[in-house]
Design a protein with these regions (language model features):
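Alpha-helical transmembrane bundles and membrane-interface segments of multipass inner-membrane proteins
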Residues: 1-159
């Protein structure tokens, strides 16, 4: 699994770029589409930008439970930071996918604290199938988890 060494510049770059990309993209889209449910076709009939406010978790599960998801986000971020601190202290390599996961968690946590909801805006449709609206932070979390899972599944057996 790719990892940052003692000075985790690549890890920090992924973390910073991911968090900034998420927050800036949300800010731009929500400035262009200021009202909830506003939408703009990007590539008909597949891809749209949409102002959607999510007070729940993934796919809107637990809608209205922003406080619970705010606490869960803080716990997840603290767990990752503690893990990274222990790994760095022991001189272990830092898994780069955690940088993306952490960046996404920070982006969505910022939204929950600042607005009381997560700003989702990427909407994908294929025929009658409509994927739940998401954002850059969600993508970073999913990609980070997928890369970590792949790394764990493909890692050689310890001797």
């Amino acid at each position: 699994m790719p990892a940052a060494r003692r000075f985790p510049w690549l890890f920090l770059a992924i973390l910073a770029f991911g968090a900034v990309a998420d927050l800036v993209s949300k800010s731009i889209v929500f400035r262009v589409l200021p009202h909830e449910w506003d939408s703009q076709t990007v590539w008909a009939p597949f891809f749209y930008l949409k102002n959607q406010r999510n007070t729940g978790g993934v796919w809107g599960i637990g809608n209205g439970a922003n406080g619970i998801f705010l606490i869960l986000s803080i716990v997840a971020i603290l767990a990752i930071v503690i893990y990274l601190s222990v790994a760095a202290f022991r001189g272990q390599r830092l898994p780069l996918p955690l940088a993306g996961i952490l960046a996404g968690a920070f982006g969505n946590l910022w939204d929950r604290i600042q607005f009381g909801f997560v700003r989702d805006f990427l909407s994908v449709r294929i025929g009658s199938f409509h994927w739940p609206t998401f954002n850059v932070a969600d993508s970073l979390i999913c990609i980070g988890c997928a890369v970590m899972a792949l790394g764990l599944l493909c890692a050689p057996e310890p001797e």
